[in-house]
A protein has these predicted regions:
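A short, N-terminal "cap"/entry segment at the start of jelly-roll beta-barrel domains
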Residues: 1-41, 57, 123-126
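Conserved short histidine dyad/triad with adjacent acidic residue
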Residues: 30-33, 45-62, 96
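Short histidine-centered beta-strand/loop micro-motifs
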Residues: 39, 56-61, 103-105
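Histidine-centered metal-chelating micro-motifs
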Residues: 54-56, 76, 92, 96-102
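Glycine- and acidic-residue-biased ligand/ion/polar-headgroup-sensing regions
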Residues: 63-65, 69-75
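Short acidic-glycine-tyrosine-enriched beta hairpin
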Residues: 81-97
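Ligand-binding loop in jelly-roll beta-barrel domains
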Residues: 96-121
Length: 126
């Protein structure tokens, strides 16, 4: 894959998937993987969660952290036992080693970017 420069969401081909054993099928596209960047980015994905679907609860390693940037819609974010409402404009950090998941209980499709970063230093367990 060439270095990442620019991508338009309307040009993406979305693939159905069941994310981390979540409920139902979400749709996503890998915009760019690690090879497309010169920094510590593992990947940038665009995802759409139709009403009633979810990204299942899961945990990344201590060498990865993940960002969710919500573009539209609303959802319930579960992180380490706590649930928070998220909506358009929210940027959420899922910490290294932290458990998290996202569900869409609402009537509209939840659209977001998922960005995974490589941790330069490995965090100590909490």
């Amino acid at each position: 894959m060439p270095r990442f420069d620019r991508e338009n969401l309307s040009a993406l081909t979305l693939e159905p998937t069941r994310a981390h054993h979540g409920v139902g099928q979400i749709h996503f596209a890998r915009i760019a993987g690690a090879e497309a960047f010169e920094s510590a980015v593992n990947f940038v994905d665009y995802a759409e969660l139709p009403p009633g679907t979810s990204i299942g609860r899961h945990r990344h390693g201590l060498d990865e952290e993940e960002l969710y940037l919500v573009l539209s819609g609303e959802g319930l974010l579960w992180r380490d036992g706590q649930t928070t409402r998220v909506g358009a404009g929210d940027l959420v950090r899922n910490v290294p080693g932290g458990a998290h998941g996202l569900e869409n209980p609402g009537p509209e499709t939840l659209r977001l970017f998922v960005i995974e970063l490589q941790v330069v230093h490995v965090a100590q367990p909490r």
